[in-house]
């Protein structure tokens, strides 16, 4: 389950009902190290959102723009793509969605081959987001369903952590295992017998 006890997402070890959540922000040396980091911090502050949270959202969106052929070297095991999962933690009304909107305004250009943001719904739907279905003719001239991958990167979002908990707890749900597989660069699809339900990603 991504190494997280999802049953605690509503409150967990954070006492959200008693006072403020204490968190350490990144220091001044970090934010002034690169112009792009200063830009992110300035944009976040101008919209009254947390710079560190906006940085996380920017990184999540940026990772979808990087082709999967760009990988982390095989320090342990094999190579893995630069996929990232970011969880913004705050009380209800804590500007989580606003934070992501700031990130969207920072990264405004979505190149061909990148989709989203799409709301997560199911593991099968996550794999389907990369594909296009079309009809072709086989050797006998009969119409057959085919698929092809048209996206190399997709941005997925989920406004509330408890929604992922509910989705993952449903009988037969594949959403959490699929996220883990996609995060590590595996194929989240299924080689089913029926062409209508077959999903494979190279």
Where are these regions (language model features)?
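Phosphate-handling catalytic cores of nucleic-acid transaction enzymes
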Residues: 2-202
């Amino acid at each position: 389950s991504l190494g997280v006890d999802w049953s605690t997402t509503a409150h967990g070890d954070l006492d959200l009902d008693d006072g403020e959540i204490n968190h350490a922000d990144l220091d001044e040396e970090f934010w002034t190290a690169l112009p792009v980091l200063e830009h992110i911090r300035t944009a976040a502050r101008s919209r009254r959102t947390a710079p560190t949270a906006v940085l996380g959202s920017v990184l999540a969106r940026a990772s979808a723009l990087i082709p999967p052929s760009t990988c982390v070297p095989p320090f342990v095991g094999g190579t893995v793509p630069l996929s990232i999962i970011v969880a913004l933690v705050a009380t209800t009304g804590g500007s989580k969605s606003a934070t992501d909107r700031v990130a969207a305004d920072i990264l405004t250009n979505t190149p061909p081959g990148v989709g989203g943001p799409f709301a997560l719904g199911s593991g099968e739907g996550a794999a389907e987001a990369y594909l296009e279905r079309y009809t072709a003719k086989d050797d006998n001239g009969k119409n057959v369903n085919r698929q092809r991958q048209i996206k190399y990167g997709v941005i997925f979002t989920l406004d509330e952590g408890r929604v992922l908990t509910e989705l993952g707890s449903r009988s037969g749900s594949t959403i959490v295992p699929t996220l883990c597989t996609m995060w590590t660069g595996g194929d989240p699809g299924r080689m089913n017998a029926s062409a209508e339900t077959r999903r494979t990603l190279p």
